[in-house]
């Protein structure tokens, strides 16, 4: 039986070690990002909630590192870490200590899933993680080590057979997709902006997996300026049937703070209302199918106020505590052209994926 939604303990992953990074003063990922979330949750009294437990993250185990990344790539990161010179890719500069920082920021996610497995908590929220662009042979897109892939491997070791990744980050998780593209033991659902307009320029609807994984890789992408109504239209027609079919025993969730209309690096038009809606639906699905086992990983989000409010919304859903961010009015409404594209894309996902799975 799933624990009661109101009695379920939520773990918050926190340690000052998470802040030991420096991509540079002009980089979108700035020092203080994770401390900011922790301070906001302290100010709003979420961290004093009786159902919240602070969990100190452990560095990502070297045994997991060697499974998710090549030795050549790990050696490259070590050398950059020692000298402070070099880069992971053009958007991801190196710095002294990057190897150990990446181990702790990615290790936070794995620490969280282990805490859920051991029943210390049934949900976790990490202000870091969601490094879904890192691939076996390289990092990129602000991502060094792929914590999502590492968590899946750890969960498989612990005996989980139906792991669902619900990735609502506005950028497609190309790295994570590559790890499990032929694996029916992992279902990946990604809602993201049209790859034509945004990094990493992949994650097309036609990419539905292969071999044993055919139909288990789901990509739904949205045109620029898509807002709350079209997003929920697609969500309601795609996501619940997939959950009902797959009946996951563990859920990893990236809530997509960077899909907000005020994010400076992206082009969707969502408000906190939809981020809350998606979080509530995923949370309810975790209790229905996975005995509450839900790991929430912040992922992207480059407006600091939005990132704070997103963290508050997540913790509100996980704990049942009240949190109401300011009323928000996006600059655009969903027009007829956006509606036409989203309806067509939604139907295409249903035609390709549902037929492959027999839904």
Task: Name each region found by the language model.
Residues 1-63:
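N-terminal low-complexity, Ser/Thr- and acidic-residue-enriched intrinsically disordered segments
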Residues 30, 34, 58, 66-70, ...:
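Generic structural signal for well-ordered secondary structure
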Residues 2-13, 19, 75-359:
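A general "terminal functional-core" signal
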Residues 57-82:
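Charged, often glycine-rich, active-site loop that binds/positions anionic groups
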Residues 44-50, 72, 119, 159:
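Short glycine-centered helix-capping/turn motifs at secondary-structure transition points
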Residues 35, 66-67, 136, 148:
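A broadly tuned "polar low-complexity/structure-edge" signature
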